[in-house]
Amino acid sequence: MEKLPTFEYLEEKAKESRFLNDPHVRRLVELSEDRSLFEKSPEYLAQLRRDLLRSSLDFFARNSEFYQKLFESQGIDPSAAEPEDLAKLAVPSDLLRGNGIERFLLPNRDPGGFTFRSSGTSGKDPVRIYRSPLELVAMTKANANLFEYVYGDYLKPGQGLALFLAAEELKNHLNFVAFVDLALQYKKIKLIYGMDLAHDASGGPLWKKLVPNKQKILEFVRSRDEPKLFFSAPAGVHLLSEQFGSLGLVKRIIYKLATGAPPINLGRGGTIVTGGGSKGFQVPEYDVIVREARKVFRAEDPSTGKEVPVPFMDVLGMTETLTALLDKYGVMQKIPHPLQEVFLLDPKTYKPMDDYNKDGLLAIFDPLAVSWLEVFIPGDIVRQIPSERYYGREFIYVRRLTEEEGWNLQRACGGTLEELMYRGGALQ
């Protein structure tokens, strides 16, 4: 299996990009690490995204006859394009299965990158998306900045400790794991993987089950580093909460003496970060997971040191997108990176819709992608609500489209991790 390159390697390879002399790409590189974007007004950012849309379409038309003809056939003039034009260009994710991405890739794209694959749990060919080193560096910096905004504080390089309740091999396969791994490398924060992958000796799928590595989990629990960041599918949070919460008095005392837990103290700035939300496989609703976890996990305000309910963040990311949407439980709904154009389509007509508090089909345009024009429909229903934050809107996740609605379901990263934990017996 192809291995995810290190962030250090990607940074060096990105310097060799053939597109660095292109004004559009140079601007993207600068914007990907611009933290001040989160302080801009919704109007300013909407104008910026429109400018990037136009320069992006121009970039692809200059570098690909395929895109030049596509824009002409759709009656789109790159120099006059509007966000409403994106609905004409949005690609359903099902078209990206197998080698579907090939027709959309620039023929002169940068080499030396990495191909991400979706989970493949639907029984169909997984979605495969190629990312150049330049794109992966931009992705890492942009996602780290978005994370810090939603987290509410700056993560000081080299400070803190993270636990990911997943096997390290999955960073070579699932986007959520790769997002986290690269971002923590960028911030120089140590990451511990708390599970092992049990391979299926008979062949077939890459894995059969995930099993907890108790020593690595205890290393995280015992550590006094701050902040402590706990990354997991919702099922993993449920697993630890249930196991520590169900201890009898004697076992609770023994565990407390040996490990200092329960409660599991995440310290100043400690946070739980889940991926993909609760998929409803065999775990409770997300509200229940949060409530039960807060009985077992403890955290402190990063400024005052006073105990606070453990903060929860959730990541909505897809194989097809460079930057994710993040939320913070009880504080904000899902919010995109300032550069990402998130728009809704009517589920029946696929026409753009601007209504608030109405179910719409999620569609995304990410201008940071320069190997293919990243405008796609992942197959999720969301609602948008007005917001006073930089984006002017926030998004509430509702559900996946069903097969009856003409969509082949593909479990997201969080749901895949959840399923693997059950296969391994970890959640029995």
Roles of regions detected by a PLM:
Residues 63, 67, 172, 236-237, ...:
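Short phosphate-engaging motifs
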Residues 119-175:
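Conserved adenylate-forming
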Residues 59, 66, 70, 142, ...:
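Amphipathic alpha-helical segments that form well-ordered structural scaffolds
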Residues 5, 47, 58-117, 125-132, ...:
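Active-site diphosphate/adenylate-binding microenvironment
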Residues 17, 22-23, 63-65, 173-175:
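Serine-centered coil/turn micro-motif
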Residues 112-124, 180-187:
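Short, compositionally biased "basic patch" segments
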Residues 1-43, 51, 55-58, 183-428:
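Active-site glycine/GP-rich loop and adjacent strand/helix microenvironment
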Residues 52, 110, 139:
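Short, glycine/acidic-rich beta->alpha junctions
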